[in-house]
Design a protein with these regions (language model features):
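N-terminal ligand-binding lobe of clamshell/alpha-beta domains
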Residues: 12-277
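Short terminal hydrophobic/aromatic SLiMs and anchors at protein ends
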Residues: 2-3, 10
Length: 277
């Protein structure tokens, strides 16, 4: 019997690996449906991609591998009936990305759920370790080891001064990231100081408030809002150190929000962008 401790907390009232009692599977799952793009990529990196029988339409990585995997809708609007048709013995979900109603419906149908709720890089690492254990991943160390080494290196580095950093995740209105989000911790671990850190969740901020924050670095991700070169002028027009010092950067949103095999490279790239001259 495979018995890896997932924990039961108040997140959706479902099995959550990070806060409560036990959860067990009789054997390693053979038919996995992943509702989380970054964890779909992780499952393939772990060496169990052949067991992934379902994915969302946003699960596009690795592109050469996922093409033949059945789609079950989006991350927020999962086709529960289609998932059940695939007869999974494990569904992989994350609180931040998947709708409570979909996860509850699958649980009510008797489907084992792995539900992660990472709010920090350390949480994400623990989640990956638990998932790797449950699926008996043959390449777990090859994926997780490099992330742990980069993470510990950044924790020990302790920059002399952390640049004030603004990361909008939406426009119209602008929305930043609060202290209880995964992106906040990614910024902090990478050496920045999140200017919206006094807030929670995703605070709405005006251009005037952005100027008051006086960010020294602005990172414009291409997801969830697709910031592009057309948005740069609006930020360079602000009276902020990031504009004066030419430190407004368009970045791949996956650097900030994806868990899994790309985390080591993401943390390295972000720490380089947040290193002031």
């Amino acid at each position: 019997m495979v018995t890896h401790a997932l924990r039961v907390g108040n997140t959706f009232g479902l099995a959550v690996f990070r806060a409560g009692a036990g959860y067990a599977l009789r054997m390693a799952p053979r038919r996995i449906v992943s509702l989380v793009p970054s964890l779909t990529e992780a499952l393939f990196a772990f060496g169990v991609g052949e067991r992934v029988v379902g994915r969302t339409r946003y699960c596009t990585q690795p592109p050469r591998c996922v093409g033949g995997v059945e789609k079950v809708g989006g991350t927020k609007k999962v086709d529960v009936g289609r998932v059940l048709d695939l007869e999974p013995d494990l569904v992989v979900a994350v609180r931040e990305e998947n709708a409570r109603e979909s996860v509850e419906a699958l649980r009510a149908a008797g489907v084992p759920i792995f539900l992660g709720a990472p709010e920090t890089v350390a949480d994400a690492l623990e989640m990956l370790e638990k998932l790797a254990g449950i699926v008996e991943a043959p390449r777990a160390e090859a994926v997780i080891g490099p992330i742990e080494r980069v993470y510990e290196g950044l924790r020990r580095a302790r920059p002399v001064r952390r640049p004030r950093t603004f990361v909008p995740i939406w426009k119209g209105p602008y929305m930043g990231v609060g202290s209880d989000t995964y992106v906040h911790d990614v910024i902090e671990v990478s050496g920045g100081e999140n200017v919206c850190g006094a807030h929670t969740r995703y605070p709405i901020v005006s251009p005037e408030e952005i100027e008051a924050f006086q960010p020294e670095v602005v990172l414009l991700p291409d997801e969830p809002y697709p910031f592009s070169a057309e948005d740069l002028a609006e930020f360079y027009a602000l009276d902020i150190p990031a504009a004066h010092g030419d430190r407004i950067h368009l970045v791949d949103g996956k650097l900030l929000t994806w868990y899994g095999p790309r985390m080591a490279g993401s943390l390295r790239q972000l720490s380089a962008l947040l290193r002031l001259p």
